[in-house]
């Protein structure tokens, strides 16, 4: 199941684990990324908490945790090469995997059609 937030994160949900990243729209707005800071595995976050930080040539921005949960994995590849976020934001450049405290809460997030309407 693919879901989106109004803060421009995407979530690919598989059971009780969500893979989280930023959308193509967000990556395009940021411009070329030069730095990514990710949360550590084992960290817990509530919905809306700052979970990661990205810096581009234009600005620094926070990436918010879309739902309550625990980080089970972070994508070291985008720390090593932040430009991956610009080239494949909704694929190889995922940010972290989140074990959801309440998987049903994802139903309240935007579907792809609603997100496309938001950024149109």
Swiss-Prot record:
One of its GO terms (biological process) is glycine decarboxylation via glycine cleavage system. The glycine cleavage system catalyzes the degradation of glycine. The H protein shuttles the methylamine group of glycine from the P protein to the T protein. Residues 17-99 form the Lipoyl-binding domain. HAMAP family: GcvH. Pfam families: GCV_H. This is Glycine cleavage system H protein. Belongs to the GcvH family. It comes from the Bacteria. One of its GO terms (cellular component) is cytoplasm. Keywords: Lipoyl. The gene is gcvH. The glycine cleavage system is composed of four proteins: P, T, L and H. The modification N6-lipoyllysine is found at residue 58. Disulfide bonds: none annotated. Its cofactor is (R)-lipoate. NCBIfam families: gcvH (TIGR00527), PRK01202.1 (NF002270). Binds 1 lipoyl cofactor covalently.
